[in-house]
Amino acid sequence: MNDKFSMGFDISTSIIGISLFKEDNFYKLFYIDLTKTKDYFEKAFIVKTRISDILYTEGVCVDNVFIEDILQSFSRGMSSAKTIIQLARFNGIVSNIIYELTGCTPVYLNVNSARKLLGIKIDKNSSIDKKEQIINWVDHDLTEKYNWPMKVVSRGKNKGVVKFEKYCYDMADAYVICKAGIINVIQNT
């Protein structure tokens, strides 16, 4: 097992996006859905079990771990102090689980710095949501189009509209973090 694998994580208390790269090439995307679990310790157990399963099933030994850094300041219309503290607490728990399972000290990357490093420009005036712009960028970055899971909205004003599954955005963010982390490692060696 000589291949070097890197993992990227977009951690939140509801969905965790995970990307796996072999050397500097995309390998797979995963997610962990925690939306139906309220207790943080139960969430941590689910995360540990799922990441263990991924590592075992894929038969990989991870050399690098990159995690999207948490918000460090308030922005208008964004998260409250309570939300940021809860996310920071959970991020720490998950980071420790990742360290225990992989033996790798995580490298934290600011999402805006990661996007800048990759040349991702978000068009704030576009009719396309910024999260969908990230998915589109990932699709353009891949040699083959990724088969993103879709759903048909069943009610409300968007009834009948086909949209990405909610976890796709987290997987795309994890891809960006991992790819930027790998480039960062290469540039600094």
Regions found by a protein language model. Name each.
Residues 1-189:
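Phosphate- and other anionic-substrate recognition elements at nucleic-acid/protein interfaces
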